[in-house]
Design a protein with these regions (language model features):
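Accessory RNA 3′-end/elbow-binding domains used by RNA modification enzymes
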Residues: 1-63, 67, 211, 215-339
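Catalytic cores of RNA-modifying enzymes
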Residues: 1-197, 201-235
Length: 339
């Protein structure tokens, strides 16, 4: 059973599960920042969060969008106060590379499921390219039967697994870019997609297969980008482990392994305030905007003081109203992560 590639479950910010090993309980600590993990195939997103949380001894951790166990690639993991910025990342664009296997439609819409229907037809590159514009822009998409979408309070994948008929309503999604990259043989096509929140690549592969009369499912899937995080930010699990062990041995600092919290807010304007105003914001109090640009500052802003991230606030009617305040006591990610 597979999980959706683009859903933030209610328990995404969760504690690491108890593995049942008789290890000495260590003291949890305040760790704040982002790890952009290059998740390996076979690992669930929840387990990846648990591993990172354990390595850092962090009190709190969560991910910014589930990645299927059979998928690899970019999984943004927030530690500590960074979990408050998860919604800003989840709402960002995603980019995927994926391979479609023609000739078989499966009940999970990926290689893990059972074959539900077959076709002898195989599309050529010209037919695939001619179809892609129909699947670009705002389109209607039905989520996979095996997905975390809720039906009368039940997850669709639980209903499907129990043998119940699952009828899911189509939803409007946005696909910004869809390209054919390669066709290594008649049975496979490799594509890239840049899409918005709520898009299922498994459904996209299924619908392309049906439209071409060839049927198909996702044979391989890799996520390359989520919001502000891209391939250059990714770090393999083995490297995270090595960096944490080096820091524990006094050969570095954990802060050097983390991206700053505000990395998740790259597209939000930044505003600097005085230490006195920063203290007021952290107490939940609004402060007056000052300076010649005060009258034109509008909307959501990220606020810093003395180079330290303070709050996410809203500028309105000549004042800044705090919406999320941050306490970065402890270990906090900083610019220029070392690898």
């Amino acid at each position: 059973m597979t999980l959706p590639i683009d859903t933030l479950p209610a328990d995404a910010v969760a504690a690491a599960p108890d593995e049942g090993r008789p290890t000495k309980k260590r003291q949890k600590r305040d760790v704040h920042g982002w790890i952009v993990l290059d998740k390996p195939i076979g690992m669930t997103s929840t387990h990846a969060v648990a591993v990172i949380k354990h390595l850092y001894g962090a009190k709190r951790a969560g991910h910014a969008g589930t990645l299927d166990p059979l998928a690899s690639g970019l999984l943004p993991i927030a530690l500590g106060e960074a979990t408050k910025t998860v919604p800003f990342v989840v709402d960002g664009r995603k980019e995927y590379s994926f391979t479609i296997r023609w000739g078989e439609e499966r009940d999970t819409d990926d290689a893990e499921g059972r074959v539900a229907a077959t076709s002898e037809s195989r599309p050529d590159a010209a037919a695939i390219k001619a179809l892609l514009p129909r699947f670009t822009g705002t389109i209607e998409q039905v989520p996979p039967r095996f997905s975390a979408v809720k039906i009368d309070g039940e997850r669709a994948y639980d209903l499907a697994r129990s043998g119940e008929t699952v009828e899911l309503a189509p939803r409007a999604i946005e696909i910004h870019r869809l390209e054919l990259v390669d066709q290594p043989d008649a049975d496979h096509a490799m594509l890239t997609a840049e899409c918005g929140k709520g898009t299922y690549v498994r459904s996209l592969a299924r619908d392309l297969g049906r439209a071409l009369g060839a049927l198909g499912h996702v044979a391989a899937l890799r996520r390359n980008r989520v919001g502000p995080f891209g391939e250059g930010d990714m770090i393999p699990l083995e490297q995270v482990e090595a960096l944490c062990h080096r820091a524990a041995a006094g050969e570095g600092h954990l802060a050097d392994t983390l991206l700053p919290i505000e990395t998740a807010l790259d597209d939000i304007p930044a505003l600097a305030v005085s230490p006195a105003d920063a203290a007021r914001l952290q107490r939940g109090q609004a402060v007056l905007l000052r300076g010649r640009d005060a009258s034109i500052v509008r909307g959501i802003v990220q606020v810093a003081s003395g180079g330290q991230f303070v709050a996410i606030a809203e500028a309105e009617r000549g004042e800044i109203v705090p919406r999320r305040v941050f306490n970065l006591a402890g270990i906090a990610g900083r610019a220029g992560r070392k690898g």
